[in-house]
């Protein structure tokens, strides 16, 4: 085998590989002989079909298969010999056979050489927060509202009330599609409706008929309503006030607390809040570290890796649509290219961090991650056992652990400052509720 390597553009490499023609001819001949022994052709006894007949019938297909195998096998030998690391599957272009050699071209991309830079220039503001008694009380109030019962009242509608109504919406005096409803139920203050709609109902009583003026947001999903002024003619049929449950042992029982009553519920709530806080703090620091790493390191990305990541993201997006995908056109790659490129770049850079620091997933950390995740389930031990018995899930958790270790390694050289933050403020920002 003879090999020549050509750097075409960027990360693309072109291998020209020559293989002795006699090698292919021998493989073809051997394959034809094997086929002759098992072929069943009318007019010939089993195992007695002449090679010329087999060649006429199957020769072209056999030769094509052999050439494919030869190209694949010799390509692998060539990249090992040339110390090349392909970032994707090669494209093979078979050339001619001159009687002495068979030549083919393999084109592919290689992984870029990554040299980490600017690690000491990464700036991280590390938030410090804790769950206080007041935070637990706030969560209990949220849970009370979620378990509220409602009863009709003869008074003006107030924030937090549920109302029932009939309404008809119009733009420029014309009703629009989707702007009409009967027996519509709405909790005031929920933010379900466009700005101004809920506020326009406050202060009105059941039985009243009135009109409110609102404006559809510029980013509204219906193109014909974006930014439009609208009127809604409303008939308020019922106002219901919330009755919140008392905070006692009976309230705790609503959440499956059979022993310990209210204090046990508070302890469980605090544990869950601490778990969520720890995850959010980690995610916040990780995002800052990753953003700093990306900003300080510009690398050429293999198109093959980006294309592969685009396909993964597209498949995930299609799965989120569920059963609605039957008649949907394929989502364009452009929707995912930027996110895919970011993910590929992060993977390459963190891979180099792991390699440079000779990191290996710590078993104790892996088990800690599994235990933390399992604690959110009714039977944590069952979840832990399931993960430990599943190779794929365990590999995923090892990857998560390695990523954590890589971020921690980067933090050692980063410029880190600490900042005290309140639990509620931090969690609202982390979950996009700020």
UniProtKB/Swiss-Prot annotation:
Major place of residence: cytoplasm
Entry keyword annotation includes Isomerase: yes
UniProt comment concerning the protein's domains: Consists of 3 domains; the N-terminus binds the ribosome, the middle domain has PPIase activity, while the C-terminus has intrinsic chaperone activity on its own.
Boundaries of every PPIase FKBP-type domain copy: 160-245
NCBIfam families: tig (TIGR00115)
Catalytic activity reported: [protein]-peptidylproline (omega=180) = [protein]-peptidylproline (omega=0)
UniProt cross-references to Pfam families, sorted A to Z: FKBP_C, Trigger_C, Trigger_N
Keyword Transmembrane helix: no
Function: Involved in protein export. Acts as a chaperone by maintaining the newly synthesized protein in an open conformation. Functions as a peptidyl-prolyl cis-trans isomerase.
Enzyme class: isomerase
Native source species: Shewanella baltica (strain OS155 / ATCC BAA-1091)
UniProt GO MF annotations: peptidyl-prolyl cis-trans isomerase activity; protein folding chaperone; ribosome binding
Protein's recorded name: Trigger factor
Any one cellular-component term (Gene Ontology): cytoplasm
PANTHER family linked to this entry: TRIGGER FACTOR CHAPERONE AND PEPTIDYL-PROLYL CIS/TRANS ISOMERASE, TRIGGER FACTOR-LIKE PROTEIN TIG, CHLOROPLASTIC
Family: Belongs to the FKBP-type PPIase family. Tig subfamily.
Record's keyword terms, sorted: Cell cycle, Cell division, Chaperone, Cytoplasm, Isomerase, Rotamase
Any one of the GO BP annotations: cell division
EC number: 5.2.1.8
Alphabetical list of PROSITE patterns matching this protein: FKBP_PPIASE
């Amino acid at each position: 085998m003879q090999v020549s390597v050509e750097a075409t553009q960027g990360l693309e490499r072109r291998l020209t590989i020559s293989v002795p023609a006699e090698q292919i001819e021998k493989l073809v001949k051997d394959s034809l002989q094997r086929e002759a022994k098992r072929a069943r052709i009318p007019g010939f006894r089993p195992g007695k079909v002449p090679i010329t007949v087999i060649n006429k019938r199957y020769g072209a297909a056999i030769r094509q298969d052999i050439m494919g195998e030869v190209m694949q096998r010799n390509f692998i030998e060539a990249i090992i010999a040339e110390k090349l690391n392909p970032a994707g599957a090669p494209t093979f272009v078979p050339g001619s056979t001159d009687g002495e050699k068979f030549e083919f071209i393999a084109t592919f991309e290689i992984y870029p050489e990554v040299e980490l830079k600017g690690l000491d220039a990464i700036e991280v503001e590390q938030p410090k927060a804790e769950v206080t008694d007041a935070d637990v009380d706030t969560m209990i109030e949220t849970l009370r509202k979620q378990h509220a019962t409602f009863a009709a009242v003869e008074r003006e509608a107030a924030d937090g009330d549920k109302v029932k109504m009939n309404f008809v919406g119009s733009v420029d005096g014309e009703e629009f599609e989707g702007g009409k409803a009967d027996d519509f139920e709405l909790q005031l203050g929920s933010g379900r409706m466009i700005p101004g709609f809920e506020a326009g109902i406050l202060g009105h009583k059941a039985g009243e008929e009135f009109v409110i003026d609102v404006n559809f947001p510029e980013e509204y999903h219906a193109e014909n309503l974006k930014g439009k002024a609208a009127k809604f003619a409303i008939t308020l049929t019922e106002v219901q006030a919330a009755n919140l449950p008392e905070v006692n042992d009976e309230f705790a029982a609503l959440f499956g607390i059979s022993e310990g009553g209210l204090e046990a519920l508070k302890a469980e709530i605090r544990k869950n809040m601490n778990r969520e806080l720890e995850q959010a703090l980690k995610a916040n620091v990780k995002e800052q570290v990753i953003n700093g790493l990306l900003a300080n390191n510009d690398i050429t990305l293999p198109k093959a890796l980006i294309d592969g990541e685009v396909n993964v993201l597209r498949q995930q997006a299609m799965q989120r649509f569920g059963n609605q995908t039957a008649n949907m056109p394929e989502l364009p790659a452009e929707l995912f290219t930027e996110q895919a490129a970011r993910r590929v770049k992060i993977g390459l850079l963190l891979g180099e961090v792991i390699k440079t620091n000779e990191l290996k997933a710590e078993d104790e950390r892996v088990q800690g991650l599994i235990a933390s995740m399992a604690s959110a389930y009714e039977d944590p031990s069952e979840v832990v056992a399931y993960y430990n018995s599943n190779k794929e899930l365990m590999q995923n958790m090892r990857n998560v652990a390695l990523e954590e270790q890589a971020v921690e390694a980067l933090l050692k050289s980063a410029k880190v400052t600490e900042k005290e933050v309140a639990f509620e403020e931090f969690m609202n920002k982390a979950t996009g509720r700020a």
